[in-house]
Amino acid sequence: MSDQLVAPPPENCPGTQSEMSGKSAACAGCPNQQICATAPKGPDPDIIEIEERMKTVKNKILVLSGKGGVGKSTFSSQLSFALSMDEKVEVGLLDIDICGPSIPKIMGLEGENIHISGQGWDPVYVQDNLAVMSVGFLLEKEEDAVIWRGPKKNGIIKQFLKDVYWNDLDYLVIDTPPGTSDEHLSIVQYLKTSNLSGAVIVTSPQDVALIDVRKEINFCKKVGVPIIGVVENMSGFVCPKCNKESQIFIPTTGGAEKMSQDMNVPFLGRIPIDPLIARSCDEGKSYLITHPNSEATKQYNLIFNKIKEIVNNSK
């Protein structure tokens, strides 16, 4: 099981094969604790299947946030839409926010179902080169609650990675829930040997959000996930009448750029508030296409180009 760990074992670790694995005092606070406590002893054959399935995916990008409500899923969707605007580029969007799957609605795929073929689970397509998978496609009704403990969440994430037939992808964007929970440990564990490109971390400017983003950055550093960069979302509001910018969420400690400098991680840019972004998400449309000349679209595209450059130059 040692090849499944997401971080080096701590001092006084009882060992991955011990009956006290994940349960001793030395395990408290270790990123591997849940893995050691719940995983069966011995190698996990599913990891080999995941590695084989992921060989056809060139770039795998995690989208993270420390706190909920900062626009992470919106960012994931618009990144996927932007990448797929090149018809020669194949894009997948995987939603592992198990308890709050919003991607089907944002992508205009409400009411769609998963179909199984001889090659595995078929993702749902927005267009020929943009495929989506989410637990939301497994629910009978949109408002159905997903009340699962960690092991069941881990199981569905593993199934998404090893059983979904993505075919050849240039990019797989992975939308995660906020925080550093079971879903994050699982995705890092399962993709550890599959050349994870890195993580984009989304925040809003105020300090209450930045506190949790610092934790997210430390999580990535601890488990060995490369940080592509930090995005400050909801950064100011430009009045459509007078073009004057107002700060809705005041960056009292310098905002995401200052925090990125302090923590020595790349800062990718700022996206202003635009109520039409929320409307596009509610309607399941690409904001970049419906509002190509807006200031937010300009900033989105600058950030997306930086992400592509960083990911492609990291190989």
UniProtKB/Swiss-Prot annotation:
Cofactor(s) required, per the database record: [4Fe-4S] cluster
Question: An example of a Gene Ontology BP annotation on this entry?
Answer: iron-sulfur cluster assembly
Please share the entry's free-text remark on the cofactor. Answer: Binds 4 [4Fe-4S] clusters per heterotetramer. Contains two stable clusters in the N-termini of nubp1 and two labile, bridging clusters between subunits of the nubp1-nubp2 heterotetramer.
**Superkingdom field:** Eukaryota
Under the heading InterPro entries, the entry gives:
Mrp-like_CS, Mrp/NBP35_ATP-bd, NUBP1/Nbp35, P-loop_NTPase, YlxH/NBP35
Residues reported to bind [4Fe-4S] cluster 1: 13, 27, 30, 36
Keywords, A to Z, come to:
4Fe-4S, ATP-binding, Cytoplasm, Iron, Iron-sulfur, Metal-binding, Nucleotide-binding
Its cellular-component GO annotations read:
cytosol
The family annotation for this protein states: Belongs to the Mrp/NBP35 ATP-binding proteins family. NUBP1/NBP35 subfamily.
Please name the HAMAP family in this protein's record. Answer: Mrp_NBP35, NUBP1
Q: What is this protein called?
A: Cytosolic Fe-S cluster assembly factor NUBP1 homolog
Q: What is the lineage of its organism?
A: Eukaryota, Amoebozoa, Evosea, Eumycetozoa, Dictyostelia
